Amino acid sequence: MLALAVSSLMAPWTAGAQPAPSAKGAPVIKEVRFGVLPLGGTVESRALWTPLMADMSRALGLPVSAYSVPSYEELDRAIGRDEIDMAFLSAKMALDAVMQRRMKVVAQIARRDGMPEHRAVLLARKVGPLHTLEGLLAQPERWRLARGDSRSVTGFVVPQSQLFLPNQIEMETRFRSEFVGTHQATALAVANGDADVATNNTTDFERFRQQFPVEAARLQVIWESEPPPGAPMVVRRDYPPEFQAKLQGFLVGYGKGKGTRADAEREVLKDLRAAYGYVAADDSALLPEAKLEYQLGRQRALSAAWVNDAAREQRLQRIEKAYAAQVEALKASSASR
């Protein structure tokens, strides 16, 4: 874990310390540990969020530190160990954390009509043996795949559910080889000839174009998905409602004012690919991701080999029951607001 305090003007505190319980049982918040999704390297991912964390620290009157890790798996484990107080997560990771009752959604990126939509993509080299989507789907065993972690919506879940499984292709087993990494790492793998095709998304590929123009010029998009569920901002569920409301107010108001400070905040948001800032949200924002996971589960069950039809039907019934429970829990959050 790489922790970085972005405000040294606050009262002394211990990096990574667990919040102490108050007399009423709720944690006493002495710092905010912000979980950072791995975009490229840990230092790069952390640096992108540092300006917003510094402003958050001033607004909340608390030190804010970045918990930056190299993989989705490590970030997931940190959430499970209560080492993270808030985070910007993939919809898949957020759904898992919310259903485990560890986190709750407080905000998500604002979208407006006419702005470019965030989509999953597949990348291949412009000059190379693989040129088309048809060639990929016809003989997946010929090609080396670079993909995201299974917790990544655009790096795994969406390509699997919208493209590969409908064509009877399991990403994990049908390709000649596979490399799992960040969106930056998968794009570099194809650009440098270490893989033939990579999962990615429009937002991170645009960032890749700016950071690696030479390598990006070697790549082409051969498939684009429908818009996937958005990534939300989550906070620990056991934190006091007053703190959650203050944090949500900061996020929703960030970059919305006038003057030099608001102008600077809007520049920060542009770097984070959130040009229009954040809007208030609750756990019901994860309903699209729950539906996507449900569809993926059904696709896998229907395409798998079973000892008999009854076994398949039992699996499908369990998937239906789990999805119904998720929907009920996520809708309950919206109703209680």
Whereabouts are the PLM-identified features?
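An extracytoplasmic/periplasmic, membrane-proximal ligand-sensing/linker region
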Residues: 29-30, 40-41, 47, 51, ...
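Bilobed "Venus flytrap"/periplasmic-binding protein-like clamshell domains
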Residues: 29, 33-57, 69, 115-188
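Pocket-lining segment of extracytoplasmic ligand-binding domains
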Residues: 139-146, 150-250
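Extracytoplasmic small-molecule ligand-binding "clamshell" domains
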Residues: 19-95
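N-terminal export leaders
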Residues: 1-2
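Periplasmic-binding protein-like
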Residues: 33-38, 111-121, 213-248, 266-283
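Short helices/loops that flank or line small-molecule/ion binding pockets
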Residues: 73-87, 100, 118, 183-198
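Immediate post-signal peptide segment of exported/extracytoplasmic ligand-binding proteins
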Residues: 16-36, 136-144, 324-336
